[in-house]
Amino acid sequence: MLRSRVPANIRAFDAFPKFSKEYRRQSSSRGGFFTILLSVLIVVLVFSQCVQYIRGIREQELFIYDSVSELMDLNIDITIAMPCSNLRIDVVDRTKDLVLATEALTLEEAFIKDMPTSSTIYKNDRYAGLRWARTEKFRKKNNAEPGSGTACRIYGQLVVNRVNGQLHITAPGWGYGRSNIPFHSLNFTHYIEELSFGEYYPALVNALDGHYGHANDHPFAFQYYLSVLPTSYKSSFRSFETNQYSLTENSVVRQLGFGSLPPGIFIDYDLEPLAVRVVDKHPNVASTLLRILAISGGLITVASWIERVYSSRAHRSTSEADMLGLLGKSETE
């Protein structure tokens, strides 16, 4: 009864007007897909920027090495399948200086069965360098008693002249006069865990680190030719001078007889006149956050444009279908 007393124009008044159906936003699975895709992209972006912030950006440049330095360190850690008493280690350089490395290095008894092989090295080193797991320059000692080992681990640091030279590991007497080591005792199968020049840097993996060499015969010779490149490293935490090198290798069976070259392991190193400077730069927190926000905003804007284009196309297709339906209905009538 009260409704009949209200004027018609007041009854028609609506404080919350209804939109026409064609302007209403229809829910669809497409919007959910775009939301999930955009969320995944933003998460990947944030993760990549965090990784870049932690690792930093590495820049390298070449320059002429003009520093004057007379000496450098030679770091070595090698295991050879021969007793220590059957080995001799020397370093000779272009100035004809001879370093009796047998006395300067540590020779430690080991066992052949404990030496890594090419298959075990590949299995353990597929995903990471051998040196990444080590924090000390040289690992702990073996458990072999003196005189009981079938192999010899040679490790330590030598101070040599900063000129071209050669480190050679041979058997006493072979190539230096009358041999006192039996022929059948020669076995220069070896595993090089560490060979570097300059200050020790665990993150720098050189070409001979983790290298395995198998001797196919008793009078076997391994020849390694190294091109040593001085390297200057600088980061936010430290800076130092070290070296890295490239490798060319060759192996051959020596011919026995007077005047023949001795079997063994020969490492020739040549110093390059060029040097490389490595600089690690870490972006600050503010620039990283601004970069994340800028790229995230760009992704959201592009995603909204794409969604709007798809929505307009879908709306146009729906309108055309409705129009065709109305025309068909009118023709039928």
Swiss-Prot record:
Sites of Phosphoserine modification: S317, S319
Biological-process GO terms, alphabetical: endoplasmic reticulum to Golgi vesicle-mediated transport; intracellular protein transport; retrograde vesicle-mediated transport, Golgi to endoplasmic reticulum
InterPro entries: Erv (IPR045888), Erv_C (IPR012936), Erv_N (IPR039542)
Glycosylation sites (chain numbering): N187
Pfam short name (any one): COPIIcoated_ERV
Parts of the chain on the Cytoplasmic side: 1-30, 307-333
Subcellular location, record wording: Endoplasmic reticulum membrane; Golgi apparatus membrane; Endoplasmic reticulum-Golgi intermediate compartment membrane
Transmembrane segments: 31-51, 286-306
Topological region Lumenal: 52-285
GO cellular component, one term: Golgi membrane
Membrane topology category: Multi-pass membrane protein
Keywords: Endoplasmic reticulum, ER-Golgi transport, Glycoprotein, Golgi apparatus, Membrane, Phosphoprotein, Protein transport, Transmembrane, Transmembrane helix, Transport
Homology family: Belongs to the ERGIC family.
Role description: Constituent of COPII-coated endoplasmic reticulum-derived transport vesicles. Required for efficient transport of a subset of secretory proteins to the Golgi. Facilitates retrograde transport from the Golgi to the endoplasmic reticulum.
PANTHER family tied to this protein: ENDOPLASMIC RETICULUM-GOLGI INTERMEDIATE COMPARTMENT PROTEIN, ER-DERIVED VESICLES PROTEIN ERV41
Protein known as: ER-derived vesicles protein 41
Species, as recorded: Schizosaccharomyces pombe (strain 972 / ATCC 24843) (Fission yeast)
Gene name per UniProt: erv41
